[in-house]
């Protein structure tokens, strides 16, 4: 129990640091804050995912947990689609947007930190992240762009999801683990250090996003 509380304390403290830094103007708004997310997405998080998967047991990817996550996501999307068709008819794009909102979960900002610091193993959240990025996201984007958009544009959206850095890192890491290859320290150690920056950057950016303009401010 103490380990669980410690894990959540780590998460909330780092989020709090991001909020305080944004409040003091150290982390700027908009594009300035999003640099944290972009750096994490393109460099730190892929490094974390590769180093985690490459040194893990590949059986985790066939865990019942992954099957439950996939089934729950698909079932929720289908349930919303059915309700949208029967109870409150909407256009195809609006239905897809609602289905995405109903079934999508925050596997990066919340999933990775909780899996790492509370559960103690990020391996189980990585298949869920890959499911989102490589399967659900391209499908959702294609559905949103289905009307009035060329097939080439839809295909480009699908390819961008499948070739996202975190997806490629997971696939390469899985191959390394399945083949039981040993990554040299000269490669793995820098990746581990870089990956260690992923969750703090994500959480601080999330904390900074909580420092926004209030709805009831006098100048609004």
Q: What are these model-derived regions, one by one?
A:
Residues 1-220:
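Alpha-helical transmembrane segments of multi-pass small-molecule/ion transporters
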């Amino acid at each position: 129990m103490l380990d669980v509380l410690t894990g959540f304390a780590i998460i909330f403290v780092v989020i709090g640091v991001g909020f305080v830094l944004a409040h003091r103007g150290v982390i700027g708004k908009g594009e300035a804050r999003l640099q944290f997310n972009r750096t994490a997405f393109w460099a730190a998080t892929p490094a974390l995912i590769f180093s985690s998967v490459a040194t893990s047991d590949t059986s985790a990817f066939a865990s019942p947990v992954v099957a439950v996550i996939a089934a729950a996501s698909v079932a929720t999307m289908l349930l919303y689609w059915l309700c949208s068709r029967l109870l409150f008819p909407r256009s195809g794009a609006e239905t897809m947007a609602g289905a995405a909102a109903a079934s999508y979960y925050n596997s990066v900002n919340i999933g990775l930190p909780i899996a790492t610091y509370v559960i103690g193993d990020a391996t189980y959240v990585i298949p869920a992240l890959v499911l989102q990025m490589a399967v659900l996201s391209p499908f959702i984007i294609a559905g949103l762009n289905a009307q009035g958009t060329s097939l080439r544009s839809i295909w480009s959206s699908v390819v961008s999801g499948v070739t996202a850095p975190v997806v490629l890192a997971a696939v390469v890491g899985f191959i390394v683990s399945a083949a039981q290859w040993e990554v040299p320290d000269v490669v793995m150690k820098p990746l581990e250090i870089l990956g260690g920056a992923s969750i703090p950057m994500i959480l601080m950016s999330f904390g900074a996003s909580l420092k926004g303009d209030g709805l009831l401010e006098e100048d609004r």
